[in-house]
Each structure stands twice: as C-alpha cells, then as structure tokens.
C-alpha cells in the first residue's frame, strides 16, 4: 500500500515528492530518514560553530540573534554567576561533536541507501522485524514504540543532567543541581491549563520525569501490544493518513513551544533570550518584543517564538490537506467544480 488512499495506486512520483517515492521500500525509507537525521545534526553543529564565531561579550546575549548558544547556556554550559558566559569552549565542543556525529549518521544513511536491502524483510538479523506495510497496525505500532522510547530517553537525559550536573536557575542567577524534582502528580498535572506559569526548576524537571515515564511506558506498550479493535476502527492505516496524524501532532508541539518561549522566563531565561513578548494580531497573529531595540533588531526569543509559530501554522495546513485526502477528498476536482459553477452563473445571467 502506497501513500495515497484513493485514485491511481501506481502513481509515479517525481523527485520533488520526497519520501513518497520510497513508500513501498522500507529499506530506502529508513535510509532517507537516517540521512535526514544527519542533515539535522549537521545543521546543529554548523550553526553552533557559526554562533560561537559571532558571539561577543559586549552585547546582551538575547540581542545577538543567536538561538543555539542560549539553549546551551540554559543547560548551564559555560555559565558563571549572574548568568554571565565565562567560557565559550563548551559551545565549540558541542558543535564539533555534532559535526562528527552527523558524518557517522550520514554514513549510515549512505549504507542503507547504497548497500542495504531495499526492503528490510530481505535483510539479515533483526532487520525484517522493522519491515512494515502501511496497513499493518501491529508492525507500525512496533516501530512507533521504539520512537517513543527514544523520546523518553531524551527527556530522561535532561532529568539526569539537571540532577547531577545542574542547569541555570534564573531565580537565583546561578547554575544549580535539581536534587529533588517535583513528583507529586497533582502539582505536575495541575499545570495543564496554565503550563506557561511553571516557575521552579523542581516542577520543570519533575514534568520531564513524567514525560520520560509516559513515553517509555507507551513505547513498551506499542512494542508488545497491537492496537485495540476500537483504535483500528478509528485510525486510517495508510501512508498519507499516518502523515496527517504526524503533521497534526507536530503542529500542536510547534504552537506549544511558541507560547512557552514567548512568555515563560524559567526555561527561557531573560538573560539569554531577552524579556517576554507581547501577542499581537494583524493580518496574522504574531509576537513582538517588549525590549527597546533599534529598528529591525529582534531578540532571540522573538526569533524562536515566531519561527515556531509560523512553521506550526503551515504544518497544520499540511495536516488538513493530507487528512482530507486521506478521507477521499480529491483537490483536483476543485477547478472543475469552480468551472462548472461559473458556467452556471453565466447561463443564469444569459
């Protein structure tokens, strides 16, 4: 089963169609995703080194149009008292590690593209376990489970980093360890309606403890348990359907990140990102700086927030597009429908 859910099942996709060309080849699909991961890691490393070269101690960090150094600073790297950057070598090291990692991951992408099996079912060892068909909910759940576990481990890594190495606390202006994360579920889940107001590192890290538990538990569940009957009836198992679900989730995360970045000063300290933003609405919603800056200059917070917001907006349009196509709506019929409608109007006037 390919990406489409209706029409011609044997569509010939052009190069611009991206991964749609590989929908029937699980090995090539894996190669594309590994290569894309390499590009992401390469971007992180290259931009990190670029920012290190541009950084100056004479201008507030939030006003230097940097987006990666503030993130690393909030993790406590290179930070002294009062949130001052005292050492940029950790940022350089992080950039180099990412560049080297991107080469290793890229080599994996090349291997799976040039030497690995086009279909994982034909591969050696455990490779066939990751072969999939778009209509096989059990196998797709198995693969989803591994993704969820990796996400959970990422959240757990942040928790361990905060507990053993410490992160920057804007309340006291110092890097400190979080030895007692909040584990009270009523406190953590009480933030659901006002999560932007998280104001202690204990609550922030405690929330990541729950995220790690939920992600890893959910991953194990999906690995060992096939979808329930009611879930199979609700979910449309097709390449385009799953793409629509993924884009919808990505849009939600983008909007959430934008709002959190705009207004929360615990995870996004003023020292590194600039002051909180104001929300405005003109032709489209947007966030503006409250800091007094020269014309055409913006804080790191404004850049991060607005980029996340507008990317989430367009990703949401992609979700709606693919969801409608999944349900059988053919956008190619719209011009014909509009043409017949205009002809009816002309005939009525005649």
From Swiss-Prot:
The chain crosses the membrane at residues 30-50, 66-86, 91-111, 204-224, 243-263, 304-324. Chlorophyll a. Chlorophyll b. GO terms for cellular component: photosystem II; plasma membrane-derived thylakoid membrane. It is found in: Cellular thylakoid membrane. Keywords: Chlorophyll, Chromophore, Membrane, Photosynthesis, Photosystem II, Thylakoid, Transmembrane, Transmembrane helix. One of its GO terms (molecular function) is chlorophyll binding. Its main location: membrane. The keyword Membrane applies. Its cofactor is chlorophyll a; chlorophyll b. It is a multi-pass membrane protein. The keyword S-adenosyl-L-methionine does not apply. One of its GO terms (biological process) is photosynthetic electron transport chain. It comes from the Bacteria. It holds the Pfam family PSII. The antenna complex consists of chlorophylls (a and b) and chlorophyll a/b binding proteins. Also forms complexes with photosystem II (PSII), consisting of a PSII dimer with 5 or 10 associated Pcb subunits. The antenna complex functions as a light receptor, it captures and delivers excitation energy to photosystem II (PSII). The Prochlorales pcb genes are not related to higher plant LHCs. PubMed:8986795 speculates that the protein is probably 2 residues longer than sequenced. This is Chlorophyll a/b light-harvesting protein Pcb. It comes from Prochloron didemni.
